[in-house]
């Protein structure tokens, strides 16, 4: 992950190393220009002498080089993090991203008599909302010694090395950290049981296991893209679909080396060239047994909030300190389809999703809840419903129908629990919903 001076020239749209000095010179005032001549291929020593003549000129040069030129290069040469293609762009500071999804509505049975009574009844849309906040505020600190600046103007080759070293010192660190943070999003999502899990044998253990992995991946991709959509492939259980060209496979280098790219491309019904753009090879996952993930392009929610360079001179130490600030929002969308292919021991149930997960119910009213069980063994699992925090008269049935007491004024927690353990050692997988209570001024209550 090194930036070469050719990368610098390409980013700045220049052809010669001394063009950088001239770009800085053109942005400065008459005082700077009076000391620093127009740079050419043959006057590096004269240019260096002009820059080094006094502290004011040096400060102007270093500040422009680091704060302006360096930042432009870093923004342009930003392709070394293989997961960077999933970033969404930049949002202003102080902004929280609100992600809204409106789920499909339920069918109603036609009833002529009921129509007269309920023609003006409201049917609120099934809207779900997620929030993503800035969670990375870091900076990178490096130092430029006076001696380094003097050495830079021995030749234009030395100057090229000097500029590259300044940029690489912080760019490499920022790129590596961003890559690791984005990988961590995958592992954290998996550790929380939020991926839909497809159990596989360890693909590199045999030719048969590798073939079976490709088959399961192809079948999964087909299911993700069926036109009617599904609730099975995202952790909010909303009904959605992906388009084949929007599915991305993230896989480690060892497994990718065993796979035939042409076979994989055919599995995704894409030509080889297009498919390669949808495969991201990484150095490995931190989670044991996690072999690959298949995600929609909208799964990553990564935004840049701030990229800024600052430079300050330390006259006592005869050096400049420069700082590169990186602020980001690093998150993922639970509305987007995301599947993990996992070998080894996989829990029979990875997640229980309660829908709606947030509800407001009037005193004396009712609310129907549904549990979506993410099972990996193709079996049905019994769901046990419970409600916590309620007063006498508030209860929930075995089918998930919550009845709220007419005197209820506490916030409630509805739980759907699946036990995948044994009688001696229960292992509970729990989904929850939060219910707020609204006062009911009308007699008899009403359904929320």
From Swiss-Prot:
Coiled-coil portions: 107-127
Cellular compartment(s): Virion
Sorted UniProt keywords: Capsid protein, Coiled coil, Late protein, T=3 icosahedral capsid protein, Virion
Sequence ranges assigned to domain BIG2 in this UniProt record: 348-427
TM ranges: none
Annotated Gene Ontology cellular component terms: T=3 icosahedral viral capsid; viral procapsid
Coiled coil found in the keyword field: yes
InterPro entries (UniProt xref): Big_2
Family the entry assigns: Belongs to the phi29likevirus major capsid protein family.
Cited function: Assembles to form a prolate capsid shell of about 54 nm in length and 45 nm in width, with a T=3, Q=5 symmetry.
Subunit structure: Homohexamer. Homopentamer. The prolate capsid is composed of pentamers and hexamers of the capsid protein.
Protein name: Major capsid protein
Gene: 8
């Amino acid at each position: 992950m090194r930036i070469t001076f050719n990368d610098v020239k390409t980013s700045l749209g220049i052809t010669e190393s001394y063009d950088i000095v001239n770009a800085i010179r053109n942005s400065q005032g008459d005082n700077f220009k009076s000391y620093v001549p127009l740079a050419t291929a043959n006057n590096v020593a004269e240019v260096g002498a002009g820059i080094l003549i006094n502290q004011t000129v040096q400060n102007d040069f270093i500040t422009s080089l680091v704060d302006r030129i360096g930042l432009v290069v870093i923004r342009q040469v930003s392709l070394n993090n293989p997961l960077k293609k999933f970033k969404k762009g930049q949002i202003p500071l102080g902004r929280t991203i609100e992600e809204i999804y409106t789920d499909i509505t339920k069918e109603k049975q036609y009833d002529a008599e009921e129509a007269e009574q309920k023609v003006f009844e409201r049917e609120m849309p099934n809207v779900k909302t997620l929030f993503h906040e800035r969670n990375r505020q870091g900076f990178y600190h490096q130092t430029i010694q006076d001696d380094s600046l003097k050495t830079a103007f021995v030749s234009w080759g030395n100057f090229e090395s000097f500029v590259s070293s300044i940029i690489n010192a912080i760019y490499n660190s920022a790129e590596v950290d961003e890559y690791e943070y984005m990988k961590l999003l995958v592992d954290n999502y998996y550790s929380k049981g939020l991926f839909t899990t497809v159990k596989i044998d360890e693909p590199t253990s045999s030719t048969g296991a590798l073939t079976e992995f490709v088959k399961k991946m192809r079948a999964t991709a087909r299911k993700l893209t069926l036109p009617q959509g599904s609730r099975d492939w995202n952790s909010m259980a909303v009904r959605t679909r992906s388009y084949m060209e929007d599915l991305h496979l993230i896989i480690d280098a060892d497994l990718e080396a065993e796979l035939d790219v042409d076979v994989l491309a055919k599995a995704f019904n894409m030509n080889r060239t297009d498919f390669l753009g949808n495969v991201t090879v990484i150095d490995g996952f931190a989670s044991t047994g996690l072999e690959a993930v298949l995600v929609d392009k909208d799964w990553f929610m990564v935004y840049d909030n701030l990229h800024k360079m600052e430079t300050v001179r330390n006259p006592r130490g005869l050096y400049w300190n420069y700082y590169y600030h990186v602020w980001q929002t690093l998150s993922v969308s639970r509305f987007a389809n995301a599947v993990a292919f996992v070998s080894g021991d996989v829990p029979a149930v990875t997640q229980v999703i309660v829908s709606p997960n947030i509800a407001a119910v009037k005193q004396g009213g009712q609310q129907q809840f549904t549990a979506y069980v993410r099972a990996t063994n193709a079996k049905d699992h019994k769901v046990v419903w419970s409600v916590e925090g309620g007063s006498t008269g508030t209860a929930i049935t075995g089918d998930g129908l919550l009845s709220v007491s007419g005197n209820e004024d506490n916030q409630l927690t509805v739980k759907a629990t699946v036990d995948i353990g044994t009688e001696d050692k229960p292992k509970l997988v729990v989904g929850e919903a939060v219910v707020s209570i609204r006062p009911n001024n009308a007699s008899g209550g009403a359904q929320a």
